[in-house]
Curated annotation (Swiss-Prot):
Disulfide bonds join 125-363. It comes from Salinispora tropica (strain ATCC BAA-916 / DSM 44818 / JCM 13857 / NBRC 105044 / CNB-440). The active site is at residues 112, 363. NCBIfam families: rRNA_mod_RlmN (TIGR00048). It comes from the Bacteria. PROSITE patterns: RADICAL_SAM. It catalyses: adenosine(2503) in 23S rRNA + 2 reduced [2Fe-2S]-[ferredoxin] + 2 S-adenosyl-L-methionine = 2-methyladenosine(2503) in 23S rRNA + 5'-deoxyadenosine + L-methionine + 2 oxidized [2Fe-2S]-[ferredoxin] + S-adenosyl-L-homocysteine; adenosine(37) in tRNA + 2 reduced [2Fe-2S]-[ferredoxin] + 2 S-adenosyl-L-methionine = 2-methyladenosine(37) in tRNA + 5'-deoxyadenosine + L-methionine + 2 oxidized [2Fe-2S]-[ferredoxin] + S-adenosyl-L-homocysteine. The lineage of its organism: Bacteria, Bacillati, Actinomycetota, Actinomycetes, Micromonosporales. Specifically methylates position 2 of adenine 2503 in 23S rRNA and position 2 of adenine 37 in tRNAs. The gene is rlmN. This is Probable dual-specificity RNA methyltransferase RlmN. S-adenosyl-L-methionine binds at residues 187-188, 221, 244-246, 320. Gene3D superfamilies: 1.10.150.530, Aldolase class I.
Length: 372
């Protein structure tokens, strides 16, 4: 294997200072919304009324809330329901089962989110940052660099829009209701900790305060920000933690996941096991299979030893192509042998379904490009 240049990364570095978007009702819980509507001279019940439209009926345009007086709708459009995401392009593939949306934010930043329909469920993949500062060399988002954190409402609004797409029947062969959310889009979710946790609370709060999703159907991915993992374990949440490991040894992980230069494999796994112990939730270990880089039998055996008898599941990801990448996905026989060795060690292992490749909507491909 050709050694890669180490890319220093500072996980504590702030995102570029940029004007955050105007406030939106999804930035607040129901009590906060009630305070806001009274400040606007409206009765408190308007907060529940508008929340029912937004979270219960998936209506994002105040003009469609026709049971509200026209003057109230105008006030709300300006103060509580500003446009946060302007659609640039929406693409579909997998016979209509996968949709990718490209959004322009108020400051011109671009982000993407993906909807994936299955016979028994509908999942959305949300972005938490515009770009990403983690600099993983095999990920298109990481190579683009970090622009800024998204607001709570910018995160939630992606889910509400895509839930509306599902409700419209546009996702072939799938239920009409959003059931799962994965924070695996653009950005490192735990580097935008407060807003991501607030967004999770909106997603799981019962309607009309939120979307009413199950906490157990929310997955938060991280490259391994150890203090944030421990902080998440202390929250009153039982979401699934997905750890983007990609290598079982520090020498290689320092190259593939530069934040490993700050927190080594042993430290990251220790935090993950603490999370599993506190929440009772199995940790998902994400591992991109890269030909001749991290797919050797001895690395499978080492990974198996690290994970044996732990509350963990390995999710192997066939490497998805990105522009200019020097790497390829591991051949299928190599992938099968990797799986065999992990299972022989007693580690639950599956290979991820590669959805959205045709539209650059698969894992590691989100780059928010406006070109064709």
């Amino acid at each position: 294997m050709t050694s890669l240049p180490l890319t220093p990364v500072n996980p504590d570095a702030p995102a570029r200072r940029a004007a955050m978007p105007p406030r939106h009702l999804a930035d607040f819980d129901l009590a906060g919304r009630q305070t806001l509507v009274t400040e606007l001279g409206e009765p408190r019940f308007r907060a529940r009324q508008v929340s029912t439209h937004y979270f219960g009926r998936l209506v994002r345009d105040p003009e469609q809330m026709t049971d509200l007086p026209a003057a109230t709708r105008e006030k709300l459009a300006d103060q509580l329901l500003p446009t946060l995401l302007t659609p640039v392009r929406e693409l579909a593939c997998d016979d209509g089962a996968t949709h990718k949306a490209l959004w322009r934010l108020h400051d011109g930043s671009l982000v993407e989110s993906v909807l994936m329909g299955y016979p028994d469920r509908v999942t959305v993949c949300l972005s938490s940052q515009a770009g990403c500062g983690m600099a993983c060399p095999f990920c298109a988002t990481g190579q683009a660099g970090l622009t800024r954190n998204l607001s709570t409402a910018e995160i939630v609004d992606q889910a509400v829009y895509l839930a509306g797409v599902a409700a419209s029947g546009a996702v072939a062969g799938s239920p009409p209701r959003l059931s799962r959310v994965v924070f695996m889009g653009m950005g490192e979710p735990l580097a935008n900790y407060n807003r991501v946790v607030a967004a999770i609370r909106r997603l799981v709060a019962p309607s009309p305060e939120g979307l009413g999703l199950s906490q157990r159907h929310i997955t938060v991915s991280t490259v391994g920000l150890v203090p944030a993992i421990r902080r998440l374990a202390s929250e009153d949440l039982s979401v699934t933690l997905a750890l983007s490991l990609h290598a079982p040894d520090d020498e290689l992980r320092d190259e593939l996941v530069p934040v490993n230069q700050r927190w080594k494999v042993s430290e990251v796994l220790e935090a993950a096991w603490e999370y599993a112990a506190r929440t009772g939730r199995r940790v998902s270990i994400e591992y991109a299979m890269i030909k001749d880089v991290n797919d050797q039998p001895w690395r499978a055996d080492l990974l198996g030893r690290l994970l044996a008898d732990r509350l963990a599941h390995v999710n192997l990801i066939p490497l998805n192509p990105t522009p200019g990448s020097r790497w390829d996905a591991s051949p299928k026989p190599v992938e099968r042998e990797f799986v065999r060795r992990l299972r022989a060690a007693g580690v639950s292992t599956t290979v991820r379904d590669t959805r959205g490749r045709e539209i650059d909507g698969a894992c590691g491909q989100l780059a928010a490009a406006e070109g064709p």
